[in-house]
Amino acid sequence: MEKAELLTRGVMDKYAQVRLSTVPLNSAGVGRYLPIADLVVNTTSVGMGGSGFDWLDISALQKGGKVYDMVYSPPLTPLLVKAKSSGHPYANGIGMLVAQGEEAFSLWTGEQPPPGVMKTRLRALLDK
């Protein structure tokens, strides 16, 4: 939790208009902020095994609130299933992973990868 709080403070120091909260990963910590949150982001490995967040009532998230789970396998984590069933916009970590791969490719080779190639290949690998 201390590391997360340091990172949060660092972002808010750099971007004064941004308000972030670091909370314990439990119903009391997360649940307290859902009614006022614009975005819920999971950066943990919870959900990778197909279970997790049983305690979270994502329907308490304010209307228009979005859910992002950095996990990319499975593509629809328990958290994202909850978001979907509650009607909240959601996304997984595939887009971020692809963007990081494309940037790394550019840095290593000095060239841009062909559009869509990495995403197509990643999806094929994840579907195996």
Placement of each model-derived feature along the sequence:
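NAD(P)-binding Rossmann-fold cofactor-contacting core
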Residues: 1-16
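Short, charged, surface-exposed secondary-structure boundary motifs
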Residues: 3-7, 53, 100-103
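Short, hinge-like loop/turn segments at secondary-structure boundaries
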Residues: 10-14, 38, 108-111
